[in-house]
Amino acid sequence: MSDPQIPPFRRAKRLAHQKVSEILAIGARAAELQRQGHPVIVLGAGEPDFPTPPHVIEAAHRAALAGQTTYTPLAGTPELKAAIVEKFRRENGLDYAPNEVIATAGAKQVIFNAFMASLDAGDEVIIPTPYWTTYSAMVDICGGIPVTVTCGEDSGFKITPAQLQAAITPQTRWLMLNSPSNPTGAA
């Protein structure tokens, strides 16, 4: 029963034209078919196909027993940021300061946060296609304009210098590069 004093939930106007993520819709349909007993190979959103390694479980258990159960700093703990800095130095030959590192719960969240913090209405984001289904929606929700550039098999699904140059305008604010690419695997 609804309370007449409480208005019904209403989506924000900026979300009115946003559709359900295609990948989530495909995953839901695949799960429905599996429940009906149909054999389905799910090529939707990826989930690990291996159990959490024992040393990770043990480290999480030790941390919980040590009382590390409260919120951490939004950009990551100093220890985590130091480990990330060291990883980039050791494996990639890149030098960053800890204040240049932000650790989040997922790639899409940090991308959305960056767009929300930096895009104004009309700013453009170049997105090579094919691309992960939510990139253009994130740009749109944050007030930007997704500018897609088709990257076909002939270029190894990579944006070419000529394509990039043609896509850049005075309104360009970002170039979205995902390596290796999801869904093509191009690096």
Describe each PLM feature range:
Residues 2-106, 113:
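N-terminal small-domain helix-loop-helix segment of the aminotransferase-like
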Residues 29, 114, 163-167:
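CheY-like receiver
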Residues 39, 123-124, 145, 171-174:
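Structural signature of beta-strand start/N-cap positions in the alpha/beta core
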Residues 95-101, 121-124, 171:
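Short acidic capping loops at alpha-helix termini that bridge into adjacent secondary structure
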Residues 117-139:
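Conserved PLP-anchoring active-site segment centered on the Schiff-base-forming lysine
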Residues 140-147:
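A short helix-loop-beta submotif of the ANL/AMP-binding
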Residues 147, 152-187:
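Active-site phosphate-binding strand-loop segment of PLP-dependent enzymes
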